[in-house]
Amino acid sequence: MRSDVIKKGLERVPHRSLLKALGITDDEMRRPFIGIVSSWNEIIPGHVHLDKVVEAVKAGVRMAGGVPFVFPTIGICDGIAMDHRGMKFSLPSRELIADSIEIVASGFPFDGLVFVPNCDKITPGMMMAMGRLNIPSVLISGGPMLAGRYNGRDIDLITVFEAVGGYKVGKVDEETLKAIEDLACPGAGSCAGLFTANTMNSLAEALGIAPRGNGTVPAVHAKRLRMAKEAGMLVVELVKRDVKPRDIVTLDSFMNAVMVDLATGGSTNTVLHLKAIAESFGIDFDIKLFDELSRKIPHICNISPVGPYHIQDLDDAGGIYAVMKRLQENGLLKEDVMTIYLRKIGDLVREAKILNEDVIRPFDNPYHKEGGLGILFGNLAPEGAVAKLSGVPEKMMHHVGPAVVFEDGEEATKAILSGKIKKGDVVVIRYEGPKGGPGMREMLSPTSAIVGMGLAEDVALITDGRFSGGSHGAVIGHVSPEAAEGGPIGIVKDGDLIEIDFEKRTLNLLISDEEFERRMKEFTPLVKEVDSDYLRRYAFFVQSASKGAIFRKP
């Protein structure tokens, strides 16, 4: 066993003595040592209950004959970090999470690992660490929050953000706003729609590294604790069989994950995270795969923020394995990839049942004929940009409008809420990329303001920043290269016409080639003052969003 290096032999007497200080017995020294990575804390609603999930994992490890050891990592709630300096630290936390786990699991040679994340950057950060370490592993998340209820309908955090815009224009009164604030988030779990956290936890199922139901079983259901026990038992079996993450996760696994993402209409952040995770697994993954597959995979699940359903409804309808059954029915699922169950994913999916034909529609009756995400290219995005196609209003699928340029998200939000943005405008928010922010903040407030102000059918937004999984509308993020790296988004001027064609996947600045070249030649990127030692280092090492916003390798 990998842990024998601290347990066996004369030279390891001091090591055993220290382990006995923890209460470890001689019998336990002969068993697999299982590390459990916990991101429990008391400030993230999606993580406040993870101590109970971790206890269930520990029970499962012991049931299977292993010895559990819990160690922590950090986490940030993007919702609470939104609209202030804290959002600059959200995406950078992903790298710290992966690094910290790699450090602990290398300093202590565990035989296996169970990863217990839940929210936006924590799940991908843990998956990156899993790929790097390549130790037998299982991921079990904390699960989604239940939707809130107000006035006879389900609501969630995005309802709150959009209600703020509605209040500004008199569509929502103060009493209603307060009621929505009080009721939208009823308890523990990751926010209730198909936002980034729930998308990533769902894609972990499709990758084969998490138990069935990982992405959809609500946080407060007892089934979540049973799944956590199962995760603890599964990892011990993987250790005994010496099955490692790279034996499970292949390019075909990523293709399954992308297809699930497109079929469900997942978060745009998945493009960023899947690219980074693939790099950690040593897999060559081109983001163009999203666009190639989106032409084949229809959008079949209409889940918040683009539809009326929530994750609990998807769970009731059969969950992610039922979505994969639709792929299987149409001959698209990559069936031969392995899973943590030591069974092929195709065999497991055959056992799945689709329990609601409206929540998970057949391919011949989709919500949209193409997948939920698209990659756009053009003279404004030579390395690509990302759009949530399932959230684009029909009349905005092709749009030409004048640019209104902002150098950060706060400026843009103030302008939108004060009525300075008019129908037809294209809001351009730049210097919000990985390097320029630094930290590639989410632009949830400006997009929610556009929706709340009743402009979603008439205003587009493009940015080198990114979006919350809750953003929707004619919005395009991850524009690469970013302005801080000399990208063309940096040369846009107020009043320039911008053409967006979601159908053709193009994003272009409508100026002459000569003018374009002149501006690019004369362009000097703005350099922002950075008041954080870590963010200065992050900005120095981070790469483009098109490369997953991972660090440059020495």
Swiss-Prot record:
The active site is at S468. It catalyses: (2R)-2,3-dihydroxy-3-methylbutanoate = 3-methyl-2-oxobutanoate + H2O; (2R,3R)-2,3-dihydroxy-3-methylpentanoate = (S)-3-methyl-2-oxopentanoate + H2O. Signal peptide: none annotated. Binds 1 [2Fe-2S] cluster per subunit. This cluster acts as a Lewis acid cofactor. The modification N6-carboxylysine is found at K121. InterPro entries: Dihydro-acid_dehy_C, DihydroxyA_deHydtase, DiOHA_6PGluconate_deHydtase_CS, ILV_EDD_C, ILV_EDD_N, IlvD/EDD_N. Its cofactor is [2Fe-2S] cluster; Mg(2+). Its EC number is 4.2.1.9. Pathway: Amino-acid biosynthesis; L-isoleucine biosynthesis; L-isoleucine from 2-oxobutanoate: step 3/4; Amino-acid biosynthesis; L-valine biosynthesis; L-valine from pyruvate: step 3/4. Keywords: 2Fe-2S, Amino-acid biosynthesis, Branched-chain amino acid biosynthesis, Iron, Iron-sulfur, Lyase, Magnesium, Metal-binding. GO terms for biological process: isoleucine biosynthetic process; L-valine biosynthetic process. NCBIfam families: ilvD, PRK00911.1. Functions in the biosynthesis of branched-chain amino acids. Catalyzes the dehydration of (2R,3R)-2,3-dihydroxy-3-methylpentanoate (2,3-dihydroxy-3-methylvalerate) into 2-oxo-3-methylpentanoate (2-oxo-3-methylvalerate) and of (2R)-2,3-dihydroxy-3-methylbutanoate (2,3-dihydroxyisovalerate) into 2-oxo-3-methylbutanoate (2-oxoisovalerate), the penultimate precursor to L-isoleucine and L-valine, respectively. This is Dihydroxy-acid dehydratase.
